[in-house]
Amino acid sequence: MIIKRREYMRIADYSVTKAVLDRHGFTFKKSFGQNFLTDTNILQKIVDTAEIDQNVNVIEIGPGIGALTEFLAENAAEVMAFEIDDRLVPILADTLRDFDNVQVVNQDILKADLQTQIKQFKNPDLPIKVVANLPYYITTPILMHLIESKIPFQEFVVMMQREVADRISAEPNTKAYGSLSIAVQYYMTAKVAFIVPRTVFVPAPNVDSAILKMVRRDQPLIEVEDEDFFFRVSRLSFVHRRKTLWNNLTSHFGKSEDIKAKLEKGLALADIKPSIRGEALSIQDFGKLADALKEVGL
């Protein structure tokens, strides 16, 4: 049975958070990027943004002492929370003791066998959403690991450093746009839902955070001949942001006359000027470029 808690008993209330940490003698580890959210209004906004209800299973990453988990468990069919810090497992058993729809998995999400784990949901056929306050130091590896996995995650609503959220959701011809924008938006739509100030965390991080909502596309944004080559071309085009596309391409592929002839032919096929910078190219442009370079033998 799921028990709905009263507002003043919320885990995220600062006094409750402090009492829990003191009771268990918990100290923060910088290596785990631990910052616990202490604002119940923001937690409710996260759940609302993710549109969590009884027809959804949730995977949470880094539950901490269970502040967000509590809100998720009240709304979702089931929550599977991955926590790498084994010191937090007994704390979560304490703070979430009233819920029978929460599984705490003491594993690194990057090493977990997710295909096996999701079968542990009581109803594994329900749509799965990822909702999490991601550690700043490992946000991108976790996101790309989950996005590129074969798990049919429906959407992600995740908190991360504001700068990273801006980069992921960026459009061409903006300072934030780059290979990360392309890597994520190829698979998913991405939009910043709202900003979270640094002042609502314990301990307070050095920067503000953002809630990013990403919804998986029915199919990738574009069709390309070779996905690995497409991502490789997009990455190398931003190695030196102030350099032209031509300079970045020749720095990677080489500057022999044969290579330069192939690059010129590929750029012409894609109808892209060598003097342009990578930040001016759309994902569709990069798709055309990658296919053209592949066609000329690069």
From Swiss-Prot:
GO cellular component: cytosol
EC number: 2.1.1.182
Location of this chain's protein in the cell: Cytoplasm
UniProt KW Methyltransferase keyword: yes
GO molecular function: 16S rRNA (adenine(1518)-N(6)/adenine(1519)-N(6))-dimethyltransferase activity; RNA binding
Subcellular location, principal: cytoplasm
Keywords assigned: Cytoplasm, Methyltransferase, RNA-binding, rRNA processing, S-adenosyl-L-methionine, Transferase
Transmembrane intervals: none
Pfam families for the chain: RrnaAD
Reactions performed catalytically: adenosine(1518)/adenosine(1519) in 16S rRNA + 4 S-adenosyl-L-methionine = N(6)-dimethyladenosine(1518)/N(6)-dimethyladenosine(1519) in 16S rRNA + 4 S-adenosyl-L-homocysteine + 4 H(+)
Binding site for S-adenosyl-L-methionine: 35, 37, 62, 83, 108, 133
Family stated for the protein in its record: Belongs to the class I-like SAM-binding methyltransferase superfamily. rRNA adenine N(6)-methyltransferase family. RsmA subfamily.
Function (record text): Specifically dimethylates two adjacent adenosines (A1518 and A1519) in the loop of a conserved hairpin near the 3'-end of 16S rRNA in the 30S particle. May play a critical role in biogenesis of 30S subunits.
Full protein name: Ribosomal RNA small subunit methyltransferase A
Gene behind this protein: rsmA
